């Protein structure tokens, strides 16, 4: 008995960011002006809306080129491989590319590390597109099932599109120690650790960035325009939207979330996110470096990559750190037992949480 299942691009449409990437490729539009690596800017970027709005027209332009047609076909081919467990198709990618993933909660120094990783390899980070280097793609997160959305399928499809972009963007690069190196800021890697571990390859390198939750929270609300006047949680930017999403996923009622103190909501998000590091399969990969937020520690990590890629006199950009440890002393008291719980959970899977360094409060 044979059953034939047909899915079209109506059920599985191509992602707008993939279309935007391919448009640059097929029309030889240079990638330039990328701002994902800016340490100091607190501006919330809105380029995503433009990409979505322009996607229908841009898709026509991409499909008018054979190269664009081939890339979209390749992405669907890889999606089928992921859906059906075609291990050999994925193994070919694993044997060619070596992924270095920078993983951590937002505002933990991951953008700096990713940018300097690219610089250590000779790239101008402003010419590396956001979809290649930074957060958001491939997609992963708390499970969603609603009209037109199955987040597990979304993870598979965006992974297929990401791998297609990796082949296009990095495929002709010179290998280092036998493989082509692909740096990626993978904020969402904790939500599906086993998935990223198995698909990107068991030899993948992970760099985990960790920061004190009070400092992370301050940086988050500053990104969104400041602490709300009433001190209550509010959604004004992407990070706060992820806080809302994650808390609702684990049982917080939306009405109750609006009444929560800003730091209480953020602290719960911080705790959950760092639990995922230990509980979703990410820890199965033992090529993990853990770096606690601090100027010297961050710069030392980057210098090691400059040495590794042949620069004997590395001059990485300085990592900017601002001392705000005099703010919110009551928050520090609330955070201490949470930090210790995370440390204990990490220990259950053999990960050493940098407790002493985190308690410095940076």
Stretches found by the model and what they are:
Residues 101-104, 124-128, 182-185, 205-210, ...:
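A structural signal for short, well-ordered beta-strand segments and their strand-loop junctions
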Residues 109-110, 211-212, 322-327:
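Alpha-helical hinge/cap motifs
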């Amino acid at each position: 008995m044979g059953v034939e299942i047909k899915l079209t691009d109506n059920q599985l449409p191509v992602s707008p960011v993939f279309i935007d990437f391919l448009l640059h490729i097929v029309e030889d539009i240079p990638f330039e002006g990328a701002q994902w690596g800016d340490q100091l800017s607190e501006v919330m970027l809105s380029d995503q809306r433009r990409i979505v709005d322009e996607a229908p027209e841009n898709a026509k332009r991409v499909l008018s080129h054979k190269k664009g047609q081939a890339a979209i076909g390749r992405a669907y081919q890889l999606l089928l491989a992921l859906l059906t467990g075609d291990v050999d198709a994925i193994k070919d990618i694993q044997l060619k590319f070596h992924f270095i993933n920078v993983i951590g909660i937002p505002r933990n120094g991951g953008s700096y590390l990713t940018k300097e990783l690219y610089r250590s390899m000779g790239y101008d980070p402003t010419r590396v597109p956001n979809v290649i280097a930074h957060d958001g793609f491939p997609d992963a997160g708390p499970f969603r099932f609603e009209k037109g959305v199955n987040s597990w399928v979304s993870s598979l499809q965006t992974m297929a599109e990401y791998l297609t972009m990796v082949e296009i963007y990095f495929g002709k690069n010179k290998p280092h120690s036998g493989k082509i190196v692909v740096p990626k800021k993978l904020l969402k890697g904790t939500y599906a650790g086993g998935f990223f571990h198995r698909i990107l390859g068991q030899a993948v390198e992970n760099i985990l960035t960790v920061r004190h939750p009070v400092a992370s929270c301050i940086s988050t609300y500053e990104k969104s325009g400041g602490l709300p006047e009433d001190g209550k949680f509010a959604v004004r930017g992407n990070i706060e939207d992820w806080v809302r999403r994650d808390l609702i996923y684990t049982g917080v009622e939306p009405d109750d979330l609006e009444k929560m103190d800003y730091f209480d909501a953020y602290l719960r998000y911080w705790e959950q996110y760092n639990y995922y590091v230990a509980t979703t399969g990410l820890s199965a990969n033992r090529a993990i470096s853990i770096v606690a937020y601090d100027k010297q520690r961050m710069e030392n990590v980057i210098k090691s990559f400059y040495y590794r890629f042949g620069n004997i006199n590395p001059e990485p950009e300085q990592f900017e750190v601002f001392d705000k440890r005099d703010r919110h002393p009551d928050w520090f008291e609330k955070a201490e037992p949470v930090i210790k719980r995370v440390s204990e959970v990490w220990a259950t899977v053999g990960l050493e949480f940098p407790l002493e360094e985190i308690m410095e409060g940076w």
